Protein backbone atom coordinates (compact mmCIF):
# COMPACT_ATOMS: atom_id res chain seq x y z
CA UNK A 1 0.00 0.00 0.00
CA UNK A 2 1.57 3.34 -1.00
CA UNK A 3 2.29 5.83 1.74
CA UNK A 4 3.94 9.22 2.04
CA UNK A 5 6.94 9.75 4.28
CA UNK A 6 6.43 11.98 7.29
CA UNK A 7 8.81 14.94 7.31
CA UNK A 8 8.99 15.86 11.00
CA UNK A 9 11.18 18.91 10.36
CA UNK A 10 8.61 20.28 7.92
CA UNK A 11 5.78 19.57 10.36
CA UNK A 12 7.69 21.36 13.14
CA UNK A 13 8.25 24.39 10.91
CA UNK A 14 4.59 24.51 9.91
CA UNK A 15 3.17 24.34 13.43
CA UNK A 16 5.82 25.79 15.74
CA UNK A 17 4.12 29.20 15.85
CA UNK A 18 1.04 27.49 17.32
CA UNK A 19 2.85 25.56 20.05
CA UNK A 20 1.50 27.64 22.93
CA UNK A 21 -2.10 27.60 21.72
CA UNK A 22 -1.97 23.83 21.08
CA UNK A 23 -0.58 23.15 24.55
CA UNK A 24 -3.09 25.48 26.18
CA UNK A 25 -5.98 23.68 24.46
CA UNK A 26 -4.84 20.08 24.63
CA UNK A 27 -2.04 19.64 27.21
CA UNK A 28 -0.98 21.92 30.08
CA UNK A 29 -2.55 25.38 30.07
CA UNK A 30 -0.92 26.30 33.38
CA UNK A 31 2.59 25.67 32.03
CA UNK A 32 1.87 27.97 29.09
CA UNK A 33 0.78 30.71 31.53
CA UNK A 34 3.89 30.24 33.67
CA UNK A 35 6.24 30.45 30.69
CA UNK A 36 4.58 33.67 29.53
CA UNK A 37 4.70 35.13 33.04
CA UNK A 38 8.44 34.54 33.47
CA UNK A 39 9.28 35.56 29.90
CA UNK A 40 10.22 32.13 28.62
CA UNK A 41 7.61 31.77 25.88
CA UNK A 42 10.48 32.26 23.44
CA UNK A 43 9.85 29.23 21.23
CA UNK A 44 13.11 27.29 21.30
CA UNK A 45 13.94 26.14 17.78
CA UNK A 46 17.24 24.31 18.07
CA UNK A 47 19.57 22.66 20.55
CA UNK A 48 23.28 22.12 19.95
CA UNK A 49 25.68 21.03 22.64
CA UNK A 50 25.23 23.24 25.68
CA UNK A 51 23.19 25.87 23.83
CA UNK A 52 19.51 26.44 22.98
CA UNK A 53 18.33 28.86 20.28
CA UNK A 54 14.97 30.63 20.25
CA UNK A 55 12.79 31.75 17.34
CA UNK A 56 14.84 34.95 16.96
CA UNK A 57 18.17 33.13 16.94
CA UNK A 58 19.09 34.24 20.46
CA UNK A 59 21.47 31.75 22.08
CA UNK A 60 20.94 30.49 25.66
CA UNK A 61 23.42 28.57 27.80
CA UNK A 62 21.44 25.52 28.98
CA UNK A 63 22.47 24.95 32.59
CA UNK A 64 19.58 22.56 33.25
CA UNK A 65 20.50 20.08 30.48
CA UNK A 66 17.18 18.28 30.69
CA UNK A 67 17.68 17.41 34.38
CA UNK A 68 20.93 15.70 33.37
CA UNK A 69 19.49 13.78 30.41
CA UNK A 70 21.69 15.79 28.06
CA UNK A 71 24.88 15.44 30.08
CA UNK A 72 26.95 15.15 26.87
CA UNK A 73 25.09 18.02 25.22
CA UNK A 74 22.02 18.15 23.00
CA UNK A 75 22.25 16.34 19.66
CA UNK A 76 25.83 15.19 20.22
CA UNK A 77 27.29 13.86 16.91
CA UNK A 78 28.33 10.53 18.44
CA UNK A 79 24.86 9.98 19.87
CA UNK A 80 23.18 10.96 16.59
CA UNK A 81 25.38 8.44 14.78
CA UNK A 82 24.55 5.69 17.27
CA UNK A 83 20.80 6.35 17.03
CA UNK A 84 20.92 6.39 13.24
CA UNK A 85 22.84 3.12 13.15
CA UNK A 86 20.17 1.49 15.34
CA UNK A 87 17.35 2.73 13.10
CA UNK A 88 19.16 1.58 9.96
CA UNK A 89 19.87 -1.89 11.39
CA UNK A 90 16.20 -2.96 11.74
CA UNK A 91 16.91 -4.62 15.09
CA UNK A 92 14.07 -6.77 16.54
CA UNK A 93 13.52 -4.40 19.44
CA UNK A 94 11.08 -4.97 22.34
CA UNK A 95 10.34 -8.59 21.50
CA UNK A 96 8.55 -10.15 24.46
CA UNK A 97 9.95 -13.65 23.94
CA UNK A 98 13.61 -12.65 23.68
CA UNK A 99 16.40 -10.85 25.51
CA UNK A 100 18.19 -7.79 24.17
CA UNK A 101 21.80 -8.11 23.05
CA UNK A 102 22.44 -4.38 23.39
CA UNK A 103 20.92 -4.25 26.89
CA UNK A 104 23.30 -7.03 27.86
CA UNK A 105 26.25 -5.12 26.43
CA UNK A 106 25.28 -1.95 28.30
CA UNK A 107 24.80 -3.83 31.58
CA UNK A 108 28.21 -5.46 31.14
CA UNK A 109 29.86 -2.08 30.52
CA UNK A 110 28.19 -0.49 33.53
CA UNK A 111 29.30 -3.29 35.85
CA UNK A 112 32.87 -2.88 34.58
CA UNK A 113 32.73 0.61 36.10
CA UNK A 114 30.99 -0.61 39.28
CA UNK A 115 32.56 -4.04 39.95
CA UNK A 116 30.92 -4.28 43.38
CA UNK A 117 27.60 -4.81 41.57
CA UNK A 118 26.32 -8.03 40.00
CA UNK A 119 23.09 -7.01 38.30
CA UNK A 120 21.59 -3.99 36.55
CA UNK A 121 17.96 -2.90 36.36
CA UNK A 122 17.12 -0.37 33.66
CA UNK A 123 14.43 2.29 34.10
CA UNK A 124 13.33 5.14 31.87
CA UNK A 125 13.05 7.92 34.46
CA UNK A 126 13.96 8.94 37.97
CA UNK A 127 10.43 8.28 39.21
CA UNK A 128 10.42 4.78 37.74
CA UNK A 129 13.79 4.15 39.37
CA UNK A 130 12.38 5.14 42.77
CA UNK A 131 9.36 2.87 42.24
CA UNK A 132 11.72 -0.02 41.47
CA UNK A 133 13.87 0.79 44.51
CA UNK A 134 10.81 0.62 46.78
CA UNK A 135 9.89 -2.80 45.39
CA UNK A 136 13.44 -4.16 45.57
CA UNK A 137 13.90 -2.90 49.13
CA UNK A 138 10.63 -4.33 50.41
CA UNK A 139 11.16 -7.59 48.57
CA UNK A 140 14.75 -8.03 49.77
CA UNK A 141 14.17 -7.13 53.41
CA UNK A 142 10.58 -8.21 54.00
CA UNK A 143 10.02 -4.88 55.73
CA UNK A 144 7.27 -2.34 54.91
CA UNK A 145 8.80 0.99 55.92
CA UNK A 146 10.50 3.60 53.73
CA UNK A 147 12.21 6.66 55.25
CA UNK A 148 12.83 9.85 53.28
CA UNK A 149 13.74 13.43 54.13
CA UNK A 150 11.69 16.57 54.60
CA UNK A 151 11.64 18.84 51.53
CA UNK A 152 12.60 15.91 49.31
CA UNK A 153 11.58 15.43 45.69
CA UNK A 154 11.68 11.92 44.23
CA UNK A 155 9.08 12.03 41.46
CA UNK A 156 5.37 12.26 40.81
CA UNK A 157 4.28 8.65 40.27
CA UNK A 158 2.39 7.05 43.19
CA UNK A 159 5.28 5.56 45.16
CA UNK A 160 7.74 8.33 44.33
CA UNK A 161 5.16 10.98 45.25
CA UNK A 162 4.76 9.24 48.62
CA UNK A 163 8.43 10.12 49.25
CA UNK A 164 8.12 13.69 47.95
CA UNK A 165 7.67 16.01 50.91
CA UNK A 166 5.91 18.91 49.22
CA UNK A 167 2.25 19.71 49.75
CA UNK A 168 2.04 21.43 46.35
CA UNK A 169 2.67 18.10 44.64
CA UNK A 170 0.85 15.82 47.09
CA UNK A 171 -2.37 17.80 47.50
CA UNK A 172 -5.36 16.06 45.97
CA UNK A 173 -3.68 12.65 45.68
CA UNK A 174 -3.62 11.41 49.27
CA UNK A 175 -3.77 8.91 50.87
CA UNK A 176 -0.50 7.79 49.35
CA UNK A 177 1.68 4.73 49.94
CA UNK A 178 1.52 3.65 53.61
CA UNK A 179 4.65 3.09 55.66
CA UNK A 180 6.54 6.19 54.43
CA UNK A 181 8.12 8.42 57.09
CA UNK A 182 9.83 11.80 56.67
CA UNK A 183 12.74 12.91 58.86
CA UNK A 184 14.59 16.25 58.85
CA UNK A 185 17.40 16.43 56.29
CA UNK A 186 20.86 16.29 57.87
CA UNK A 187 19.54 14.83 61.14
CA UNK A 188 21.32 11.59 62.05
CA UNK A 189 19.60 11.34 65.43
CA UNK A 190 16.18 11.38 63.75
CA UNK A 191 17.34 8.77 61.25
CA UNK A 192 18.68 6.56 64.04
CA UNK A 193 15.33 6.75 65.81
CA UNK A 194 13.39 5.96 62.62
CA UNK A 195 15.57 2.96 61.71
CA UNK A 196 15.80 1.53 65.22
CA UNK A 197 12.41 -0.18 64.86
CA UNK A 198 14.06 -2.48 62.29
CA UNK A 199 10.89 -2.20 60.21
CA UNK A 200 12.41 0.10 57.59
CA UNK A 201 13.28 -1.44 54.23
CA UNK A 202 15.15 1.55 52.79
CA UNK A 203 16.30 5.09 53.42
CA UNK A 204 15.89 6.98 50.13
CA UNK A 205 17.75 10.29 50.07
CA UNK A 206 19.04 12.87 47.60
CA UNK A 207 22.78 13.57 47.99
CA UNK A 208 21.87 17.22 47.33
CA UNK A 209 18.23 18.22 47.66
CA UNK A 210 17.19 19.78 44.37
CA UNK A 211 14.13 21.57 45.76
CA UNK A 212 15.83 24.41 47.59
CA UNK A 213 19.34 23.06 46.91
CA UNK A 214 19.98 21.87 50.46
CA UNK A 215 23.50 20.56 51.04
CA UNK A 216 24.27 17.76 53.52
CA UNK A 217 26.94 18.11 56.14
CA UNK A 218 30.14 16.14 55.59
CA UNK A 219 29.00 13.69 58.26
CA UNK A 220 25.40 13.08 57.16
CA UNK A 221 25.65 10.64 54.25
CA UNK A 222 28.50 8.51 55.70
CA UNK A 223 26.65 8.47 59.01
CA UNK A 224 23.40 7.50 57.29
CA UNK A 225 25.16 4.64 55.51
CA UNK A 226 26.55 3.40 58.82
CA UNK A 227 23.11 3.51 60.44
CA UNK A 228 21.58 1.61 57.53
CA UNK A 229 24.19 -1.12 57.91
CA UNK A 230 23.60 -1.21 61.67
CA UNK A 231 19.85 -1.78 61.31
CA UNK A 232 19.82 -3.85 58.12
CA UNK A 233 18.20 -1.09 56.05
CA UNK A 234 19.03 -0.54 52.39
Regions found by a protein language model. Name each.
Residues 2-48, 102:
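Active-site-adjacent loop/helix segments that line or gate small-molecule/cofactor pockets in enzymes
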Residues 6, 31, 59-147:
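Glycine-rich loop-to-alpha-helix module at the N-terminal edge of alpha/beta enzyme cores
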Residues 41-62:
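Active-site and channel-lining beta-strand-loop segments
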Residues 58, 202, 233-234:
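Hydrophobic "anchor" residues on beta-strands that sit immediately upstream
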Residues 66, 89-90, 188, 207-211:
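A short, flexible beta-alpha/helix-coil linker loop
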Residues 69-72, 210-214:
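Short, small-residue-enriched loops and turns at beta-alpha junctions
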Residues 107-202, 209-211, 222-226:
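PLP-dependent aspartate aminotransferase-fold enzymes
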Residues 215-234:
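Catalytic PLP-binding core of fold-type I/II PLP enzymes
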